[in-house]
């Protein structure tokens, strides 16, 4: 249809058709609207892009796993488990740090400050390995032995540093390995020595009830025959008997050098008890006699201890305690008041009957 010599316009959005020359031409689609994704070639392009992105992510993940496996195992084999590979890496790092600590500790004069820093770093690494086993954790034998060896060095380091609270913490952690895992782990060479030190520590702090509680956890054979356990048990018996001279003599028969620290604390405690009794029982005591009773080997040590206690040596070489003793009137018994209370109590009982 022609209007004024021109062909009629095809409505917008419809394909144009042509029959020039008697032949039908192919349908020509109009260009797509900008931003439209409804055309087939747009859908094909978006699908291709998604496939490329997926393949890229898979390739990156495979490369990352290969790098992790190469770092942990020293090869290009892909690790089968991410958490397992991490645990192996942490264990290897802890083992390397432990070897450094062990080398420093085994020196003739170890650097205690350096050992303390190494122990601090190792404890942080062990936290990632659950070095205190619980019911829900499953640790390998290698992990348990490594953690136990580190804690044993920590306990001995605490004694050399004279850090009693630190020693008590290390021993509380070691008991888990000594008692709960004694069937799964080989016996440690330092187990009896450290358990004996723990008993001596409780004895030096006058924690007798805890001493007997720990003693009950040990086999009877170890108590009777093991030299590390037998020594603190004998000291406790001497204290109960009041044989203080045997306690002082036992210092020269210690099973290990590390026992000296707690033995000295125990002897100082005993000296303080004896000195308190001297102040109550004697009005005055000769210098030589005080030196013998308090088990001092030299007069200088006796003089230093007397100054610490506030004792003053008189002109006749006597220590006088008359001013420190209670006056007779302070120790009188209120017999009249006690008699009245007893009579009143008897009267009330008679009324009840």
From Swiss-Prot:
InterPro entries: 26S_Psome_Rpn12, CSN8_PSD8_EIF3K, PCI_dom. Expressed in the Sertoli cells of the testis. One of its GO terms (biological process) is proteolysis. It comes from the Eukaryota. The keyword Ubl conjugation applies. One of its GO terms (cellular component) is proteasome regulatory particle. Residues 165-334 form the PCI domain. There is a cross-link at residue 300 (Glycyl lysine isopeptide (Lys-Gly) (interchain with G-Cter in SUMO2)). Keywords: Isopeptide bond, Proteasome, Ubl conjugation. Residues 1-25 are annotated as: Disordered. PANTHER family: 26S PROTEASOME NON-ATPASE REGULATORY SUBUNIT 8. Component of the 19S proteasome regulatory particle complex. The 26S proteasome consists of a 20S core particle (CP) and two 19S regulatory subunits (RP). The regulatory particle is made of a lid composed of 9 subunits including PSMD8, a base containing 6 ATPases and few additional components. Interacts with DDI2. Interacts with TASOR. Component of the 26S proteasome, a multiprotein complex involved in the ATP-dependent degradation of ubiquitinated proteins. This complex plays a key role in the maintenance of protein homeostasis by removing misfolded or damaged proteins, which could impair cellular functions, and by removing proteins whose functions are no longer required. Therefore, the proteasome participates in numerous cellular processes, including cell cycle progression, apoptosis, or DNA damage repair. Belongs to the proteasome subunit S14 family. This is 26S proteasome non-ATPase regulatory subunit 8. It comes from Mus musculus. The gene is Psmd8.
């Amino acid at each position: 249809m022609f209007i004024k010599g021109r062909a009629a316009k095809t409505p917008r959005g419809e394909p144009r058709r042509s029959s020039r020359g008697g032949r039908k031409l192919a349908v020509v689609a109009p260009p797509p609207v900008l931003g439209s994704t409804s055309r087939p070639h747009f859908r094909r392009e978006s699908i291709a892009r998604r496939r490329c992105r997926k393949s890229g992510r898979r390739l990156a993940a495979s490369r990352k796993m290969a790098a992790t496996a190469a770092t942990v195992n020293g090869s290009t084999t892909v690790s089968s488990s991410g958490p397992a590979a991490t645990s192996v890496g942490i264990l290897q790092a802890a083992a390397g740090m432990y070897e450094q600590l062990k080398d420093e500790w085994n020196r003739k004069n170890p650097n205690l400050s350096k050992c303390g820093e190494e122990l601090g770093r190792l404890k942080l690494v062990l936290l990632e390995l659950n070095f205190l086993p619980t019911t829900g954790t499953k640790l390998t034998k290698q992990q348990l032995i490594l953690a136990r060896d580190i804690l044993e060095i920590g306990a001995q380091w605490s004694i050399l540093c004279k850090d009693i609270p630190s020693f008590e913490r290390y021993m509380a952690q070691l008991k888990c390995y000594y008692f709960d895992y004694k069937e799964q782990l080989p016996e440690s060479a330092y187990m009896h020595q450290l358990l004996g030190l723990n008993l001596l520590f409780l004895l030096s702090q006058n924690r007798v009830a805890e001493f007997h509680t720990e003693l009950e956890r040990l086999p009877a054979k170890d108590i009777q025959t093991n030299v590390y356990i037998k020594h603190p048990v004998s000291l406790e018996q001497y204290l109960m008997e009041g044989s203080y001279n045997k306690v002082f003599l036992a210092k020269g028969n210690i099973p290990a050098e590390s026992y000296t620290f707690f033995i000295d604390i125990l002897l100082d405690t005993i000296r303080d008890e004896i000195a308190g009794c001297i102040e109550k029982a004697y009005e005055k005591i000769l210098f030589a006699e005080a030196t013998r009773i308090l088990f001092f080997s030299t007069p200088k040590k006796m003089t230093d201890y007397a100054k610490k206690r506030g004792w003053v040596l008189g002109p006749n070489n006597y220590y006088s305690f008359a001013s420190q003793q209670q006056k007779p009137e302070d120790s009188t018994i209120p017999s009249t008041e006690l008699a009245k209370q007893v009579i009143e109590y008897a009267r009330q009982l008679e009324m009840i009957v």
